[in-house]
Amino acid sequence: MLSNDILRSLRYTLKVNNNDMVRILALSAMESTSASFDTWTTKEDEEGFVRCPDIILSGFLNGLIYDKRGKDDSAPELALERRVNNNTVLKKLRIAFSLKTDDIQAIMSEQKYRVSVPEITAMMRSPD
């Protein structure tokens, strides 16, 4: 799945427009424009499609965490990942929406994905 697909899905799920997405990205100290988000949320087979860099998706997810949970000035800044995978996206969404393991399992089973609690905790572990 491309970063563009994830951004597009989040845009529709959160019911936000490009200006809101620029605002959320800015919370992670990154800059962009509404026009950039317009090209990043364009479907791959449509004219005007531009591939979204992973670091932008990472910044947007960090901004979403700050938007939903607030920024803790005593904590270090969230790291920007240059390579984003599905586990990273899931971890950041879990933090942003304060989801517990049971919540993730319920969401996955509602979407017809069979996943156990140990599998979810394994996905959330650091890759170290």
Regions found by a protein language model. Give the residues of each.
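A cross-kingdom feature marking solvent-exposed beta-strand/loop segments within repeated
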Residues: 1-8, 16-52, 75-78, 85, ...
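Short, solvent-exposed interaction modules
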Residues: 62-114
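Generic detector of well-ordered alpha-helical segments enriched in charged/polar residues
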Residues: 38, 57-65, 90, 121
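Intrinsically disordered, low-complexity basic tails/linkers immediately adjacent to helix-turn-helix/homeobox/MYB/SANT
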Residues: 48-70
